Amino acid sequence: MNARETRKKETIRRILDAAAQAFAAAGFEGARMDDIANRAGVNKAMIYYHIGDKRALYTEVLHNIFGDAAARLTANLEHAASPNDKIKAYLRSIFETIERHPHLPPVMMREMAAGGVNLPEIVAGDLASIIGTIA
């Protein structure tokens, strides 16, 4: 990976981290792109260039988190033989995901309070995949 690609990945990571913080604090409707840009240390145009509009940003934040959660669950379930081991692996995955993504619980609580109206379809698919893994 060259220096330009490294800077691009770092910029996107900062944008996604800042967006997760903003969505946790204010919800989808209350989060402002200007605030996210300030938190990330970029101008607003960089967000639109790298990610897109606020809906695309929200989708990307949640899709990344739930993709990570699914990968953790799959890895933790790999060696779980008994139902008891599977429950432990599932709980471990939840705790690991929350530890890595501390903004997830407030974002999801706000989403549930809003009736899921802002939950992107791709994220609903991610959740279904996670549920399918444990079923």
Q: Which residues are covered by each model-predicted region?
A:
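Helix-turn-helix
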Residues: 14, 18, 22-56, 60
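Hydrophobic alpha-helical connector segments
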Residues: 74-106
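Amphipathic alpha-helical segments used for helix-helix packing
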Residues: 86, 99-124
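Alpha-helical transmembrane segments of multi-pass integral membrane proteins
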Residues: 59, 63, 92, 124-125
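N-terminal intrinsically disordered/low-complexity leader segments
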Residues: 1-10, 17
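Amphipathic alpha-helical packing segments from all-alpha helical-bundle domains
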Residues: 67-74, 100, 117-135
